[in-house]
Swiss-Prot record:
SUPFAM superfamilies, A to Z: Enolase C-terminal domain-like (SSF51604), Enolase N-terminal domain-like (SSF54826)
Active-site residues, Swiss-Prot/TrEMBL: 133, 235
Organism the protein comes from: Escherichia coli O1:K1 / APEC
Catalytic activity of the protein: (1R,6R)-6-hydroxy-2-succinyl-cyclohexa-2,4-diene-1-carboxylate = 2-succinylbenzoate + H2O
The EC number(s) this enzyme carries: 4.2.1.113
Protein name (database record): o-succinylbenzoate synthase
Origin organism lineage: Bacteria, Pseudomonadati, Pseudomonadota, Gammaproteobacteria, Enterobacterales
SMART domains cross-referenced by the UniProt entry: MR_MLE
GO biological process: menaquinone biosynthetic process
Pfam family name, one: MenC_N
Cofactor(s) demanded: a divalent metal cation
Matching HAMAP family: MenC_1
Pathway(s): Quinol/quinone metabolism; 1,4-dihydroxy-2-naphthoate biosynthesis; 1,4-dihydroxy-2-naphthoate from chorismate: step 4/7; Quinol/quinone metabolism; menaquinone biosynthesis
Role according to the record: Converts 2-succinyl-6-hydroxy-2,4-cyclohexadiene-1-carboxylate (SHCHC) to 2-succinylbenzoate (OSB).
Length: 320
């Protein structure tokens, strides 16, 4: 006997969260809970404004239609990426095919005063990997901050993300202020320039490895080994079903590329599932999941060690 619930939710964000030049005041999304006999599976559907093609209203319509079909015996997963991801997670939990083991290590997202960051990063236990957003300020300033961090902490490796913010000139201005002796400790720089060709040229000219992120979701993207390309960053909420995520990870690994499972600012429920996916598909790589602190609450499932208050399922708006 099948049953299902769909919940709508909204979490207040910390002040200062800006995506693609727009302030994100709340994170809006949906949960689906599927039950069959004694088993239960949850999934999160939370399109990311400015990045997802669909809105959460679009996703809600598709999800509710899918749930009614599933209750009638149809299991075909929808095409809409955020719905496909959430539904496939719920089905995987229901079938007990999503392993419970999770990788809760996170590459901390660094912002704020560089001196404070140096103290925080120096005290990090184990492998020191951190992420810095670049491209929000002047490229010269970004280069100076990155250089300062790498100089101060000799065993630090940085993941940088420019979100295609730079022209080739801006990219060169950034690189000019990063000591060539430190550049090998930039694990990768995600999408430095507005076009893939300019990003490839940046990697060749600077010796700084790059990673593809937005490119993975473009229709003409193909997985090929390229000089200067070291990694791909996979955001399942923007990608689609678990099967599609696994296919992309396998394609990257076949080329010797690092695959990083990364957050699209999901709630704690979605983040804990991403931690499980990372442990399953990319066990040797620290995932990019350090986004919970951007929110003011957790929901349904806790992220281990987080002090944020937990909102129980009973407090959510039920749609079905």
């Amino acid at each position: 006997m099948r049953s299902a619930q769909v919940y709508r939710w909204q979490i207040p964000m910390d002040a200062g969260v800006v995506l693609r030049d727009r302030r994100l005041k709340t994170r809006d999304g949906l949960y689906v809970c599927l039950r069959e006999g004694e088993r239960e599976g949850w999934g999160e559907i939370s399109p990311l404004p400015g990045f997802s093609q669909e809105t959460w209203e679009d996703a809600q319509s598709v999800l509710l239609a899918w749930v009614n079909n599933w209750l009638a015996g149809d299991c075909e997963i929808p095409q809409m990426p955020s719905v496909a991801f959430g539904v496939s997670c719920a089905l995987a939990e229901l079938a007990e095919t999503l392993p419970q083991a999770a990788n809760y290590r996170a590459a901390p997202l660094c912002n704020g005063d560089p001196d404070d960051l140096i103290l925080k990063l120096a005290d990090m236990p184990g492998e020191k990997v951190a992420k810095v957003k670049v491209g929000l300020y002047e490229a010269v300033r970004d280069g100076m901050v990155v250089n300062l961090l790498l100089e101060a902490i000799p065993d630090l490796h940085l993941r940088l993300d420019a979100n295609r913010a730079w022209t080739p000139l801006k990219g060169q201005q950034f690189a000019k202020y990063v000591n060539p002796d430190y550049r090998h400790r930039i694990a990768f720089l995600e999408e430095p320039c507005k076009t893939r060709d300019d990003s490839r040229a940046f990697a060749r000219e600077t010796g700084i490895a790059i990673a593809w992120d937005e490119s993975l979701r473009e229709p003409d993207f193909a997985f090929v080994a390229e000089e200067g390309v070291r990694a791909v960053v996979i955001k399942p909420t923007l990608t689609g079903s678990l099967d599609k995520v696994r296919e992309q990870v396998q394609a990257a690994h076949a080329l010797g590329l690092t695959a990083v499972i990364s957050s699209s600012i999901e709630s704690s429920l979605g983040l804990t599932q991403l931690a499980r996916i990372a442990a399953w598909l990319t066990p040797d790589t620290i995932p990019g999941l350090d986004t919970l602190d951007l929110m003011q609450a957790q929901q349904v499932r806790r992220w281990p060690g987080s002090p944020l208050p937990l909102v129980d399922v009973d407090a959510l708006e039920r749609l079905l």
